[in-house]
Amino acid sequence: MDDGSTDETVKICESFPQVTEIHSQKDLPFDETRDKNKLLEIALKRDPDFIITLDGDEVVMPNSKQRIFYELNVLYPNVSLFEMKEIYVWDEPNRYRCDGIFNNTWSKKLFRLKNQPEDLQFARTKFPGNAHCAAFPDNLIGGTQSVRSKVKILHYGYYDEELRKKKYNFLNKLDPNNTEFDGYRHIFSEESKFSGPNGMEFRLISEIEE
C-alpha cells in the first residue's frame, strides 16, 4: 500500500517480481484499521494458506524460512495464530534495545487461513485514527490460542534519532496527552514507565539465541 509516499518506495517495490499489486491512496486521514482491511482484501484475492502482517519498517530475521515452515507444518499444524518477538534495531545494524518493554514485545503477526470465516476483518480501536490496531483479524478462529514462534522480527522504525523523533511527533499529534502509552516517551527516553529500571540497555543482534 502506497499512502502518498514521496521517496522511492513505489519504484523499489515495482522492481520486485513477487510484488503482485500496489494499492495507491493519497490525502486520506490516518486510519490503521481501514488500511489493514484493504490490504487483507487484496491478500485474500491470492487465495493464500497463510498471511503475515509486517509493517513497512519490519523484516523477518534472515534465515528464518525453514523454521517458519517447520513450525507451521510439523510442530503446530493446527494452530491458527503465531506470535513473533520484536527486535528493535537501534542506531547500529547489529545493535538492539533490550530494556523494559523492548525486551518483551511479542506481536501476533502470522495467521493460518484454513477453516476461517470469509468475512475476516480487523477491528476498530479506541485510539484516534484506529491506531494500535491488532496485526490479526478480530474474528479469526483460534485467535485466543496463539503460539510463540522462535522466528523474530527486526523492527527498524526507531533505528536512529531522526526516525524516533518523527515517530514520537506523529503519535503525539495523532493521540495527544495519551496516558496509557505514557505519552510515547519510551520511543526516545529512558525515563518512561515502559523503559527499564537501569535506563537504556543494548545487546548485539548477532548474539541472539536461535
Question: What feature does the model see in each segment?
Answer:
Residues 2-12, 26-29:
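A conserved acidic beta->alpha catalytic loop
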Residues 33-37, 62-210:
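Catalytic-site signature of metal-activated, phosphate-bearing donor transferases
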Residues 47-61:
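Short beta-strand-to-loop acidic/aromatic patch adjacent to the donor-nucleotide binding site
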Residues 37-50:
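Active-site nucleotide-sugar/metal-binding loop of Leloir-type enzymes
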Residues 11-14, 64-66:
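Short amphipathic alpha-helical segments
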Residues 23-27, 37:
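CheY-like receiver
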Residues 1-3, 54-55, 82-85:
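Short His-Asn-centered micro-motif
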Residues 15-19:
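Short, conserved SAM-binding/catalytic segment
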